[in-house]
Amino acid sequence: MLRGPRCLYIYLFFVFLPFSFCYIRNNDNRFVYIVKSIRKGPNIKLRLTKDEKPNIDNHIIDYFKNVREHFPFFKENKSLIYFDSAATTHKPSCVIEKMSEFYKKENSNIHRGIYKLSHNATNNYEKVRETIKEYINCEKNDNIIFTNGSTYGLNVVCKMMIEEIIKKEEDEIYLSYMEHHSNIIPWQEYINKEKKGRIKYVPLNKSGYINIKKLISNMNINTKVISICHASNVIGNIQNIEKIIKKIKNVYPHIIIIIDASQSFAHIKYDIKKMKKNKSCPDILITSGHKFCASLGTGFIFINKELSSKYKFKPLLYGSNIITNVSKYKSKFVTSLSELLETGTQNIPGILSMGISLEFFKKINWNYVYQYEMYLYDLFIYYMNKYMKNHFVQLPNLNLSYKKENINYKSHMQTHPPVHKYNDEQNFTNDHNITQSKQTKSIHSQHDTFKIYTHDTRKYGLKKIGILPLWSNTFSSFDLVTFLDFKNICIRAGHHCASLLHKYYLKVPDTSRISIYFYNTPQEIKYLAQQIASTSFMLNEMKNEK
């Protein structure tokens, strides 16, 4: 045992060690040290500010440079900068070649054709179903239904099951403010027409993530369905659906959970068997093929076998291969869900393209995908911070505004009154159950403001996809996108079919949306930031001249 002065020195060293980090700074304050007491464990973290240029291993950049070579779109459009992959992704050569090959050599309709060409087309069509099951690692008895996209899929799911589930006025359907209109309007239409059921909205926390604890406390025995997106198509937040599903099912196992995976499927590898083992598997999962590098007009629905055995689903359309017997006044239908919901002639080459796309995805290193997309995401913030700062001298009333920590909001509020009303409590709740913290509140200034809505929650283990919405109260989002188009840059403006998110969470009418994918490059990110900064400056000057 140590005694005397030596023991005292060691004791003082460990007592004051955490506080010593508080005074460590380099000359330009580029590092922020987050320090916690050493008594709580070695939890000292180093975080780079937005002034610090992000880094990634060069071999990962080279890896995705090689992946990009598989996309002929970029060879044919060398001067075009494409940042609209949340709307649709480009197609690798193997997908384009397969669709062309079908029309050249294999063109035939499926099912009921006895001749060899039709038989082969049917087999190849059904193989895609097996490819999807293998890719998402689901069971053989689980259902995969082909659709023409997520909008159709969400409508099909609502209409085929709502009469079975929503039978009383007090029955509840939970949605979120982040939902695409196709996951809101079908539920609204049924409720307004039939006068049964009611819609409630899940509470969001300060960062745009679902407040799970509050959600569970709001639910009850009358809650029948929760239908939410895995990733927002506007702010890019990836919800922790496994945690959400597990907690809901533990308390209310009867609730049907529907996940819209339109934005997430191209960025996240799903493992249904693992989710089932952890009791965190959705009952239904819906996605679009064209958003994971397959053809336009394609998609699929996953329906858990446990759900399909419990309910009798209705077809949305009648005719074609869903009929087993037709009499003068009554008809009988098939029981197979895939046959029941795939009425009429399908987009056969498009469905085949989904299989080829997933075979292409199997070769992608998914450990690299998230790292690379977040590197590009951070690189954009870095360059925007750099180039917009250059404009501060010329245009002092233009602010680059983040949802950022370590800001003295109390003094800021005295000179920049916010649009939002705060109460005296630590958190506030508006009329729409959206909670936000004072310390991370986005500031809507009375002065000219340019905002990038980004709240970096990765240090808390909450993930994002590479989507960044921009907004200015000085100029229109549509003007920004139009002028960027003159510079061969493709980004999207509007409410992106998510008007509730804009109205109740972002509190703006529309945004300009940048969506990043693994075929984008650091050079494109730099050019994008340069042009947004210069275009914003120009649009401000145009306004000031009026």
Curated annotation (Swiss-Prot):
One GO term of the biological process aspect: cysteine metabolic process
Keywords: Apicoplast, Plastid, Pyridoxal phosphate, Signal, Transferase
Outcome of gene disruption: Parasites require exogenously provided mevalonate for survival. Apicoplast structure is disrupted.
Protein name stated in the entry: Cysteine desulfurase SufS
Species per Swiss-Prot/TrEMBL record: Plasmodium falciparum (isolate 3D7)
Coiled coil: none
Documented EC number(s): 2.8.1.7
Catalytic residue list: C497 (cysteine persulfide intermediate)
Role description: Catalyzes sulfur activation and mobilization in sulfur mobilization (SUF) pathway for iron-sulfur (Fe-S) cluster biogenesis. Active when in complex with a partner protein SufE. Required for apicoplast maintenance. Plays a role in the development of sporozoites in oocysts in mosquitoes. May provide sulfur for MNMA-mediated tRNA modifications.
Disulfide bonds: none
Recorded GO CC terms: apicoplast
Gene that this sequence comes from: SufS
Main location (coarse class): plastid
A molecular function (GO) term: cysteine desulfurase activity
Entry-annotated residues carrying N6-(pyridoxal phosphate)lysine: K291
